[in-house]
Amino acid sequence: GLMVKTLDDVYEPSRRSLNWLKLKKDYLEGLGDSFDLVPIGAYHGKGKRTGVYGAYLLACYDEETEEYQSVCKIGTGFSDEDLQTLSAELNKHKIQEKSSQYNVSDVLECDVWFDAVQVWEIKAADLSKSSAHRGAIGKTGEAGRGIGLRFPRFERIRDDKRPDQATTSDQVLDIYYNQDAVKGQELDEDDDEDGI
């Protein structure tokens, strides 16, 4: 990110100030990566989010295996209205257990599973190799490691796309390898920041 400050302010360690702001590429229009992902599961909300889903598990689509591979757990970017609407809509598509088409680590077991029926546009700061997420699993060059999104944020529903038209695992892998941080040096391993 880029640090922006007022001209007359001085830096004070361990102190937050509205005079010093960090500007991240995913907050600027046209910068940052955007993904079209499928919500395949959810986690019950707590506190302010009681009665709706507080976070969702999203997946990319692998064309070779015809499976949905988890790439992020997301809980940010939603308005209160979004949370109500999405919970109500996805409740119509609940399934009893995780689909055999879903490649998800046991550590990400959801409270509720859904049929693959929607596509959401998601912005993310970066991608990293992950032992928890399964995006492009088997293609990363490391056994048991997939690709996960860092700091994912909900943007909107993509009504113009079917789930099998979501961002593919190959696209996720290409975006991962085209990051400046990966071209130069690796991001910290397992630095999945789900934003919740």
Report each predicted region and the residues it spans:
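Catalytic cores of nucleic-acid ligases and guanylyltransferases
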Residues: 1-196
